[in-house]
Amino acid sequence: MLRTKGFSLIELLVVVAIIGALAAVGTLAYNGYVSGARKTAAQNAMQQIGLMQTEYYSIVGEYYGEASCTPSAASTSAINTNLFDGADSIDVEKYWFCVHEETESGSQVGYVVKACNISGDACGSTNLTLNAKGENNF
């Protein structure tokens, strides 16, 4: 009987199936790492906004903030303009930010930085907050 060198069809199919399974697991793991990295970048940006709030307060005498706050592209742009003077900016892929002013009896007592994960054109399910006292829900 003449024996040819090479792999049988079954052996090739097994190898292709194993490579496919490894690729699927690897892709899911990679997407999880990317999502986690974006969330960490958003947390860092929120802390940077908090630091700029301290500087803004020392110059102006009050915190920057909006009476009502829903994270959007416009509110993120307003933060870049008002807190960072356009010299620096926060630009975290897939996240929008806003700053809400906290008041008691009509006077400003602090702020809350809000961030949301963009899902399409609206905020998704991941919402992060950081207040003037450093309390957060990271």
Residue ranges: model-predicted function:
Residues 2-30:
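N-terminal single-pass transmembrane signal-anchor helix
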Residues 11-14, 18-20, 55, 109, ...:
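N-terminal hydrophobic or amphipathic segments with adjacent small-residue motifs
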Residues 8, 13-14, 41, 45-49, ...:
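A generic structural signal for ordered secondary structure
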Residues 4, 41, 106-108:
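A generic fold-level signal
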Residues 58-138:
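Periplasmic/extracellular, small/polar-rich flexible segments of pilin-like filament-forming proteins
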Residues 19-24, 28, 45-47, 53-54, ...:
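Alpha-helical interaction segments
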